[in-house]
From Swiss-Prot:
Keywords: Cytoplasm, GTP-binding, Ligase, Magnesium, Metal-binding, Nucleotide-binding, Purine biosynthesis. The gene is purA. The active site is at 13 (proton acceptor), 41 (proton donor). GO terms for biological process: 'de novo' AMP biosynthetic process; IMP metabolic process. Its cofactor is Mg(2+). GO terms for molecular function: adenylosuccinate synthase activity; GTP binding; magnesium ion binding. It is found in: Cytoplasm. It is an enzyme of class 6 (ligase). This is Adenylosuccinate synthetase. Mg(2+) binds at residues 13, 40. Pathway: Purine metabolism; AMP biosynthesis via de novo pathway; AMP from IMP: step 1/2. It catalyses: IMP + L-aspartate + GTP = N(6)-(1,2-dicarboxyethyl)-AMP + GDP + phosphate + 2 H(+).
Length: 432
């Protein structure tokens, strides 16, 4: 038995929600360790759809403990809204099934506003990153700048005013520079007071909780958000998110030592998608790209934005395997490729006439690389609902084997539809 870390190996939207839900039945605890409510997923359980952006997937399953770690930035208003929405769907969230790290950073209204101000200014200058305008980046900035308001601060009214002063000294200077009205100290105090009673009952010392549960033999599932190529360090900077999304962050963002993380499962789509700005070497602007988007229903859960689509990029996923120490992958949306006459896989790039086997860190070079493809025969048969290798066409199996060889990691799970049971289990990560 081992713990399992789930990470996206591409630009997010790889189908982590279904796989995490599938694994959560085997877990005792499900932990979010980075990001905020800027990435969402939909779970379908007994015909009911649950849309989650901040809460760990475990909250919708009875008997599971969901944990939000210190690496997450928490918008208390979004948290309360998500809890209330689930309550109306019959899922009651209490301290018995949800705990929040006392040292997690809060996203406030001023963070959301600053995010929007900056994106508007960047749009005018052609330097837009394409954020969700939800305040994620500004909240992480305050965390690193040591001026953030954290969950525990809601319980300490004696020291809170001084912390708000420090926060506003920074933010009001920015707002003046942007030509925006300053925010009063009382407005922030009122905002914090309005959410404290709803948030504090869930507060806990998460690192200690997880350590105790680990020693008792609990199975812990760490649920990543976004994807490796959106990592602040290892992604396509600056078109990235504001946190580390790689597996190592599961330790830093929860307080669990890295030696206890266990199996690293990389969720990997059978083709490639990306939302928003940034380089995308295998992007398709033709009818195949349109086919993938329509067949794969490639629209964002949180923003509704249309995703850009392209061929599978083995060079990029190979980098993700290395950066995360991926043990095995869950290959998703294989069924979307049904019916294509031929399939291409990117195995590397050319840059200035030279062949390279990885995506450079340089923004200019990332924009200049050209993909090098191999071509495989497609398949006409349907893979939808396949639950064993015997259900798959021979060419589909060849495609999967080629992916494994090129990325240097085995397929542990294979998903053939959005339905959670339409999954081929090769290796149970909890038993590996």
């Amino acid at each position: 038995m081992t713990n399992v870390v789930v990470v996206g190996s591409q630009w997010g939207d790889e189908g982590k929600g279904k796989i995490v839900d599938w694994l959560s039945e085997r877990a005792d605890i499900v932990v979010r360790f980075q990001g905020g409510h800027n990435a969402g997923h939909t779970l379908v359980i007994d015909g009911v759809s649950y849309k989650l952006s901040l809460l760990p997937s475990g909250v919708v399953r009875p008997g599971k403990l969901a944990v939000i770690g210190n690496g997450v930035v928490i918008d208390p208003h979004a948290l309360i809204a998500e809890i209330d929405k689930l309550g109306k769907q019959g899922v009651q969230i209490t301290p018995d099934n949800l705990r929040i790290a006392d040292n997690a950073t809060l996203i406030l209204s001023l963070h959301r506003e600053l995010d929007g101000f900056r994106e508007d200014a960047a749009s005018n200058s052609g330097t837009k990153i394409g954020t969700t305008r939800r305040g994620i980046g500004p909240a992480y900035e305050d965390k690193v700048g040591r001026r953030a308001i954290r969950v525990m601060d809601l319980a300490d009214l004696d020291t809170l005013p001084a912390k708000v002063d420090r926060l506003l000294t920074h933010h009001n200077a920015l707002r003046r520079g942007l030509g925006e009205a300053e925010i009063s100290h009382q407005a922030i105090m009122d905002e914090l007071s309005s959410v404290a009673a709803r948030v504090l009952p869930f507060m806990d010392t998460v690192w200690l909780l997880l350590d105790k549960e680990r020693r008792k033999g609990a199975r812990i599932l760490f649920e990543g958000a976004q994807g490796t190529l959106l990592d602040i360090d290892h992604g396509t900077y600056p078109f990235v998110t504001s946190s580390n999304t790689v597996a190592g962050q599961a330790a830093a963002g929860s307080g669990m030592g890295p030696g206890a993380l266990g199996y690293i499962l990389g969720i990997t789509k059978a083709y490639t998608t990306r939302v928003g700005e940034g380089p995308f070497p295998t992007e398709l602007h033709d009818e195949v790209g349109q086919f993938l988007g329509e067949r794969g229903h490639e629209f964002g859960t949180v923003t509704g934005r249309k995703r850009r689509c392209g061929w599978f990029d083995a060079a990029l996923v190979r980098q993700s395997v290395a950066a995360n120490g991926i043990t095995g992958i869950a290959l998703t949306k294989l069924d979307v490729l049904d019916g294509l006459d031929e399939l291409k896989i990117c195995v590397g790039y050319t840059l200035d006439g030279q062949e390279i086997d990885h995506l450079p860190a340089s923004q200019a070079q990332q924009a200049s690389v050209k993909p090098v493809y191999i071509t495989l025969e497609g398949w006409k048969e349907s893979t939808v609902g396949a639950r064993s290798w015997a259900d798959l066409p021979a060419q589909a199996i060849k495609y999967v084997r080629q992916v494994e060889e090129l990325i240097g990691a085995p397929v542990a799970l294979l998903s053939t539809s959005p339905e959670r049971d339409d999954t081929i289990l090769v290796t149970d990560p909890f038993e590996d």
